[in-house]
Every structure is written in C-alpha cells, then in structure tokens.
Swiss-Prot record:
GO terms for biological process: negative regulation of DNA-templated transcription initiation. It comes from Actinobacillus pleuropneumoniae serotype 3 (strain JL03). The keyword DNA-binding applies. It is found in: Cytoplasm, Nucleoid. Keywords: Cytoplasm, DNA-binding, Repeat, Transcription, Transcription regulation. The lineage of its organism: Bacteria, Pseudomonadati, Pseudomonadota, Gammaproteobacteria, Pasteurellales. NCBIfam families: division/cell wall cluster transcriptional repressor MraZ. Gene3D superfamilies: Transcriptional regulator MraZ domain. Disulfide bonds: none annotated. Belongs to the MraZ family. The gene is mraZ. GO terms for cellular component: cytoplasm; nucleoid. This is Transcriptional regulator MraZ. One of its GO terms (molecular function) is transcription cis-regulatory region binding. Residues 5-52, 81-124 form the SpoVT-AbrB domain.
Length: 152
C-alpha cells in the first residue's frame, strides 16, 4: 500500500528515485517493474506496480471498441502506458511524452494512492490539494451518496 506525499527531483535524464521505503516491496512483489500512464481526468501521471496495471488492463480490455468514449479511454490509457524498470539505485525513467503531458519540470510530487502513485508537477499539486481541501465541507461533498456511510 502506497501512502503519503513525497517531493522528488527529476534528474536531467528524466529519472526519478522511488522513495526507499517502497523499493524492497516493489522489487520483491513486482520485480521492480512499474507502468506509468496518463490520468484521463487530471494533469498528472499514474504509476502502477506491474501486477496492479495488469488488473487495469483487464478492465480496459472489457470496454467496447465500438463505443467512441470507451475507445478513447482505451486509446489514451493504454497508448501512453510505458513500462518502467527500477535500476539498481531505485530510479525509473519517465518518457519525455509522459513528462510533457503532466508538465513535469525539476520538482515533482509523488502521491501514494493505495495501489498506485500519482505524479504531479509540484505547483499543480499545490493548486489541486487546495481545491480538494476547500471542497471538504461543501454541499456537493456532503450530498455525495458514496461518502454518506464513510467513517474515518
């Protein structure tokens, strides 16, 4: 399970270092292989351990190729999906295309989301989290059926 927010630098080759606390698990359970793709709703990237990505792929495969919206989702998520193998130093390479999509520069935020990470450009993350926190007490959130029984 991935949790927390970590500020990470991108080196001049486009590599990021996975935080040390996750490396052993990723190597042991996923052979150090991750898959990075774009988020279809946000200007960020999604980084999955390979086995988690394979579950997502099955869901994408189940979508209809004949429905234009479903086909678009397949095209974007699968089309951008790139395998990233951790090197001996725990780094992965983010392709220029992926970095461009999320407008990644020198400093990024790696955000644990249980079964995956989100990768955000640091200023975009600050803006998004401020918006998310402001929504906390809104009528929209209070009326959301899926959240009515959520107890934290």
């Amino acid at each position: 399970m991935f949790r927390g927010v970590t500020s990470i630098s991108i080196d001049n080759k486009g590599r990021i270092a996975i935080p040390t606390r996750y490396r052993a698990e990723l190597r042991e359970q996923h052979e150090g292989v991750l898959v990075c793709t774009v988020d279809i709703r946000q200007p960020c990237l999604l980084l999955y351990p390979l086995h988690e990505w394979e579950t997502v792929e099955q869901k994408l495969l189940a979508l209809s190729n004949f429905d234009p919206m479903q086909r678009r989702i397949q095209r974007v998520m699968q089309g951008f999906a790139t395998e990233c193998e951790m090197d001996a130093a725990g780094r992965i390479l983010l392709s220029p295309t992926l970095r461009q999509h999320a407008q990644l520069e020198q400093q990024i935020m790696l955000v644990g989301q249980l079964n995956k990470f989100e990768i955000w450009q640091d200023k975009q993350w600050q803006s998004q989290i401020a918006e998310d926190l402001a929504l906390g007490g809104s009528a929209e959130m209070l009326n959301c059926e899926a959240l009515k029984n959520l107890s934290l």
